[in-house]
Amino acid sequence: MFFSSKLTKWTYWHAEKDASLGKAHKTGKGVAAGVNLARDLGNLPPNDCYPEYLSGVARELAGQYEKLTVKVVSQAQAEKMGMGAFVAVAKGSERQGQIIVMEYKGSKPTKQGPVALVGKGITFDTGGISLKPGANMGEMKYDMGGAA
């Protein structure tokens, strides 16, 4: 490894003095906050990060941003909507299943139409449990990472 003993140049940008940096700084902070939240949710055990908890976090997040809305579909509502596969999986838990629908309405309408991102938010997926080695059971909590 090479370590320089002399500092030859130091450059410092300040967001308040350069508008383009201010926007980039704000975007960077938002991305970092999202990454940190997803990591923190993924690290929670499933007895702490269960469907109601995850939907509560989504609602809190929507409360912080006016362009973000959250609708939660309960297990009973999902059953009425004919979502049999979801309801069947949810019945395998002592907790009620929930579907979280988050919508971000940006400031500019686009000609391309909306973009939809779908993330699997199953907080502890036991599908195929008989096929999974016991040593990896603890990692099933990460199945909700796509939604986080």
Feature annotation, model-predicted:
Residues 1-123, 136:
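N-terminal hydrophobic/helix-forming segments and targeting peptides
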Residues 58, 115, 126, 130-148:
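Alpha-helical metal-binding/catalytic segments enriched in His/Glu/Asp
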